[in-house]
């Protein structure tokens, strides 16, 4: 079964006047936590073959942590993965991506709430609340998605 990692970005800077939401970076604490979480994912054997992320800075930085931990893989930014992204569009895209995926393929998506929670529900009909630096692990088998694990930073950090 192919695997999909749906990852929420790490801890971002607070909202502040004059800074666009899309420009908010990870905090120093967010960097440390996110590095540890991504190392933990890879340590569990969840090493992506390809990755997709929101173009928002905090998502780009979170994906950079995973990219480094995994030793590199092809990356692509998508405006469909922003907080206002449409889960319906993402579902169609993911179904196409996984239609002929080899059973050992692992793809990672780094995005935001509420988009990720809505996407998990759309794919699996299960509710999950992805906090910062959380990862929903989904398996794709015979056209169906299954939520097999919800990993929190405490589950993945040393």
Predicted regions located by residue number:
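Short, flexible active-site-adjacent loop segments at beta-strand->alpha-helix junctions, enriched
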Residues: 10-11, 57, 81, 113-115, ...
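Internal catalytic or translocation cores that form aromatic/hydrophobic pockets or channels
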Residues: 80, 85-107
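Secondary-structure boundary motif
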Residues: 43, 68, 96-103, 140
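Non-DNA-binding regulatory cores of transcription-related proteins
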Residues: 97-133
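Active-site-proximal alpha-helix that buttresses catalytic centers in soluble enzyme cores
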Residues: 2-81, 85-88, 129-130
